[in-house]
A protein has these predicted regions:
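Intrinsically disordered, low-complexity acidic Ser/Thr-rich regulatory segments
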Residues: 1-65, 117, 123-127
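C-terminal boundary/linker segments immediately following FHA domains
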Residues: 42, 76, 95-128
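Short hydrophobic/aromatic patches on the structural cores and recognition surfaces of FHA
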Residues: 42, 71-74, 80-84, 90-93, ...
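Hydrophobic multi-pass inner-membrane translocation pores used for secretion
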Residues: 45-46, 50-56, 63, 67, ...
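Short cationic/low-complexity microdomains
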Residues: 33-35, 87-103
Length: 128
């Protein structure tokens, strides 16, 4: 092994793509439920971009195709789950308890509290 590789110091990735952090349960209107830690993509057939790495690819069954192939991205920051719309065809709406619904601007991250519902086309997911 080359000396420069042998002496490489491994550093923590602070929950970015490392599968570490708080656990969240994503409960979908389709009846599907997934426990996630770290980062991921949600959709009918989610795929990362070249060079992008995520902990989870969450595929939901959605024959009506109102949910995009890669509809939402999620991750964690300081133990809080965030989502970002991936320029989906039908958009996403955040419905946090006690607040007005907020349409997601594609590419922006929205921090979610447990109990928040995110609409994706004709389907939705509740974070717990």
């Amino acid at each position: 092994m080359a000396p420069d590789v042998e002496n490489t110091r491994i550093v923590s990735r602070s929950g970015i793509g490392s599968g570490t952090g708080a656990r969240f349960v994503l409960q979908f209107s389709t009846g599907e439920s997934f426990t996630v830690v770290g980062s991921g993509l949600i959709g009918r057939n989610p795929r990362p971009e070249p060079g992008e790495f995520v902990d989870h690819l969450v595929t939901i069954t959605e024959p009506a195709r109102s949910v995009s192939k890669t509809h939402l991205e999620f991750g964690q920051e300081d133990g809080v789950l965030w989502v970002s719309d991936r320029h989906s065809g039908n958009g996403s709406i955040i419905r946090e308890p006690g607040t007005e619904p907020r349409p997601c601007i594609p590419g922006l991250r929205y921090r979610l509290t447990r109990g928040t519902r995110v609409d994706m086309g004709e389907q939705f997911v509740v974070v717990s």
